[in-house]
């Protein structure tokens, strides 16, 4: 695996590697389907690293697309959710899901919002004010969002200015 798609400004020499094996957890989100169908707002999923947020997001994407029949735009910046290779998703994320992989989140959300007319937008690991700005824009357009953040509990979100703004939205 090379570093060609990543915008490095320094040497792209690799000194260490961390290997994460993504896996599908069928029906992981099935109990949330009725709630998602009736929830009028967007959803923020918080948890510490390794808690299963990305696995939950993957299954929620499939549920919203296939079970609820909604148009979904999936922002998969690091190829973790759909695991696209050669233009094909290796994980089932739904028949009505448009995937943009390998593109910075804020840029990908803007492109998907303007070109794919999503009813839902799914985004993993919000970490930048630019991400939140585009999420607000999507919300103003009537797009429902599901996003994840790293936080062990609600207090962690409230103490971080970036995430505090999400709780107020």
Task: Name what the model sees in each region.
Residues 52-53:
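Conserved glycine(s) of the Walker
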Residues 45:
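Hydrophobic anchor at the beta1->P-loop junction of P-loop NTPases
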Residues 24-28, 99-107, 126:
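A general structural motif
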Residues 56, 60:
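Hydrophobic positions on the alpha1 helix immediately C-terminal to the Walker A/P-loop
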Residues 116-169:
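Conserved P-loop NTPase nucleotide-binding/switch module
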Residues 37, 64-112:
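P-loop NTPase switch/communication element
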Residues 49:
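The conserved Walker
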Residues 1-40:
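P-loop NTP-binding catalytic core
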């Amino acid at each position: 695996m090379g570093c060609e798609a990543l915008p490095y400004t320094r040497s792209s020499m690799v000194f260490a590697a961390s290997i994460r094996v993504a896996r599908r957890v069928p029906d992981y989100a099935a109990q949330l389907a009725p709630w998602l169908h009736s929830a009028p707002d967007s959803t923020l999923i918080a948890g510490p690293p390794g808690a299963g947020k990305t696995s939950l997001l993957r299954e929620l994407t499939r549920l919203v697309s296939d079970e609820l029949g909604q148009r979904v735009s999936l922002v998969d910046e690091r190829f973790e959710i759909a695991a696209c290779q050669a233009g094909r998703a290796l994980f089932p994320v739904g028949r009505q899901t448009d995937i943009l992989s390998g593109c910075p989140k804020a840029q990908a959300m803007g492109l998907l919002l303007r070109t794919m007319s999503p009813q839902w937008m799914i985004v993993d690991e919000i970490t930048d004010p630019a991400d939140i700005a585009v999420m607000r824009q999507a919300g103003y357009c009537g797009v429902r969002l599901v996003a994840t953040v790293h936080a062990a509990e609600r207090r962690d979100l409230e103490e971080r200015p970036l995430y505090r703004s999400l709780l107020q939205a």
